[in-house]
A protein has these predicted regions:
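Short, flexible helix-loop junctions that flank or precede catalytic/ligand sites
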Residues: 1-173
Length: 173
């Protein structure tokens, strides 16, 4: 499959763990080439059914956006972008998703609506319509998550909001 799947939440909300679980599941069930761009690499993935290339920003590559521009020459099926930090990185991720790849990414936002708005507002206002259109075509889902303290015992529990785009949601974007 292709498109863009985002896992969002504040620092320490388990975004990296969720993405590592998704990558591991795909690695067990699918075959293909997975490329991860991370800062830093938090989970090391071994090859199962997929060939996995993990790159660390700062040591293996200069930036997320620069890595994304060069990445298509390695013929990935799935791409994980550790963090969509700026318009250049977001645009590269959207373009890769548009060209038939499955792209996972994270943002530090607290809700699905805030995530959509953050992506659009990362660009100058004269590009908002173009970004909205592209996002509405490639978005496959957003998981906004937080770790919430348990009420009657120690520890935390995962709370999440999931947006799966329907035709109506795509039109609203």
């Amino acid at each position: 499959s292709n498109g863009l799947i985002l896992v969002t939440g504040p620092t320490g909300s388990g975004k990296s763990t969720t993405l590592a679980s998704l990558i591991d599941r795909l690695n067990e069930k699918e075959s293909g080439h997975i490329i991860t761009l991370e800062d830093p690499i938090e989970f090391v993935h071994s090859h199962k059914k997929c060939f996995i290339t993990q790159r660390e920003i700062g040591s293996d590559s200069i930036s997320f956006s620069r890595s994304l521009k060069a990445l298509l020459r390695q013929d990935p099926d799935i791409v994980l972008v550790g963090e969509l930090r700026d318009a250049e990185t977001i645009e590269a991720a959207l373009t890769i998703a548009e060209t038939g790849h499955l792209v996972f990414g994270t943002l530090h936002t607290n809700s699905c609506v805030q995530t959509v708005n953050r992506i659009i507002n990362a660009f100058p206002s004269d590009r908002h319509d173009q970004v909205r259109t592209l996002l509405s075509f490639v978005l496959q889902g957003i998981v906004a998550q937080q770790l919430i303290p348990k009420t009657f015992e120690s520890g935390r529990v995962l709370g999440m909001e999931i947006l799966l785009p329907t035709t109506a949601i795509r039109n609203l974007i």
